Amino acid sequence: MTDAADLPYRRNVGAMLFNAQGRILIGRRTDQPGAGGPLDGGVWQCPQGGIDADEDPEEAVLRELREEIGTDRAVIMGARPDWLTYDLPAALIGRALGGRYRGQTQKWFALRFTGQDSDIRLDDQQPPEFDAWQWIDLPSLPERNVGFKRDIYRTLVRDFARFSQPA
């Protein structure tokens, strides 16, 4: 068994993508069907992903949008000044995130979606990260995710509420 204390945190970026109505995009993960996501089955989350070596977080968040939802139609409106960190539950240590990390430390960005819904293409990446997506109201975000990430999402709802006003 892997001891979590011996593992590092994975550096990661998260994208809270707001549409013109002030709603945010979430996607249903393809790799975790029925994993305890509270609504509609599966796990729903904002686009996010690892930061490549020699990549700055701003570049990484735009790359993740291209990879996960197939669009570059977004502009960065703001970012959290600090990083948010979560630990994986004990049952996932040594299994999730390639078994190499105890959790993630995340730099989160608020972005404005500048395209049309038809610009979102989940099949640009193979295998796709998400099999469905939807726009939701910001306050409902924490309850749409797995329990061990809810505190991060509650913090983001509070900190990014100013971006949820219609454009």
From Swiss-Prot:
Q: Give the source's domain of life in one word.
A: Bacteria
Q: What is its EC number?
A: 3.6.1.-
Where does the Nudix hydrolase domain lie? 8-158
Task: Provide the transmembrane region boundaries.
Answer: none
The set of disulfide-linked cysteines is none
Q: Which BP terms in the Gene Ontology apply to this protein? A: nucleoside phosphate metabolic process; ribose phosphate metabolic process
Q: Which GO terms describe its molecular function?
A: bis(5'-adenosyl)-pentaphosphatase activity; guanosine-3',5'-bis(diphosphate) 3'-diphosphatase activity
The prosthetic group or cofactor this protein requires is: a divalent metal cation
Q: Which HAMAP family match?
A: Nudix_RppH (MF_00298)
NCBIfam families listed in its UniProt record: PRK00714.1-5 (NF001938)
Q: Which family does it belong to?
A: Belongs to the Nudix hydrolase family. RppH subfamily.
Output this protein's name. RNA pyrophosphohydrolase
Organism from which the protein derives: Gluconacetobacter diazotrophicus (strain ATCC 49037 / DSM 5601 / CCUG 37298 / CIP 103539 / LMG 7603 / PAl5)
Which gene specifies this protein's sequence? Answer: rppH
